[in-house]
């Protein structure tokens, strides 16, 4: 069970790291 949680956490972190920077840059450009 804990292994499953670790795998899910790793996937979520990977997705966030991949998706968040472009979104942040886009929001920064829009606000600027």
From Swiss-Prot:
Any GO BP: amino acid biosynthetic process
InterPro entries assigned: IlvGEDA_leader
Keyword tags: Amino-acid biosynthesis, Branched-chain amino acid biosynthesis, Leader peptide
Domain of life the protein comes from: Bacteria
Protein name (Swiss-Prot/TrEMBL): ilv operon leader peptide
Primary gene name: ilvL
């Amino acid at each position: 069970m804990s292994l499953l949680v670790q795998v899910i956490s790793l996937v979520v972190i990977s997705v966030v790291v991949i998706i968040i920077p472009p979104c942040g840059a886009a929001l920064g450009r829009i606000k600027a």
